[in-house]
């Protein structure tokens, strides 16, 4: 239960640490499987597994898990069935099937195949830190995170969230870190970065497993490129790639943190998840405010 990506949202209103009420709210959007003709469906499932509440509470945070089911209908399968039906019509009626009729046949094919389609399931995890005032979503893309937020808002009813903003642009500050080779005292450079040319859309440089203090990197900065993503290590406790949108990618908690969960000697998978979640949220409760401080502090809501 260690998040691998981190997209934070600022809570604009106080949320009470009330697991029972939160569970009741999410019950309205509890996951149920797709119907025979439904292409997709999403809803919340118990983080600790079947039979457990829809909300797991620990250390002032409320953990949620959104499950999505998507029916898989390969385009090649649809095309093959369409061609067969269109061919039968054209052979029987000695005429060409036009676009409108082709579209209708396609819809019929999808309807017929849908009940037999395989399903793919995906889970997205997130938690509300009621003490620090953040929603944290483990998502590899903004689209995935926004879907989680939309579902949580629908279930919650009165949840006001927005992406945090800092006083200074993260891209400007991270570019300065590379240019001056000076970082905050609790940060060390990693070996990965993405630089982009602000005057040429799509022009970017990606480096991995390279010395970011090298002359090559300095030449890119001198040529006017700006940092969009930068790999760092924080206080020798975790490492991540910071994005200019304040998300963290490839988040990795180091052994100094993970070993604390092992020291608790959990007896079940649920106890292990609870231990991991408690440690992770306490660590991120320190990291996220510090992330904002690196870029001049978080802006007050307008």
From Swiss-Prot:
This is Recombination-associated protein RdgC. NCBIfam families: PRK00321.1-5. It is found in: Cytoplasm, Nucleoid. Keywords: Cytoplasm, DNA recombination. Disulfide bonds: none annotated. GO terms for biological process: DNA recombination; regulation of DNA recombination. It comes from Halorhodospira halophila (strain DSM 244 / SL1). InterPro entries: RdgC. One of its GO terms (cellular component) is bacterial nucleoid. One of its GO terms (molecular function) is double-stranded DNA binding. Belongs to the RdgC family. Transmembrane segments: none annotated. May be involved in recombination. The gene is rdgC. Pfam families: RdgC (PF04381). The lineage of its organism: Bacteria, Pseudomonadati, Pseudomonadota, Gammaproteobacteria, Chromatiales.
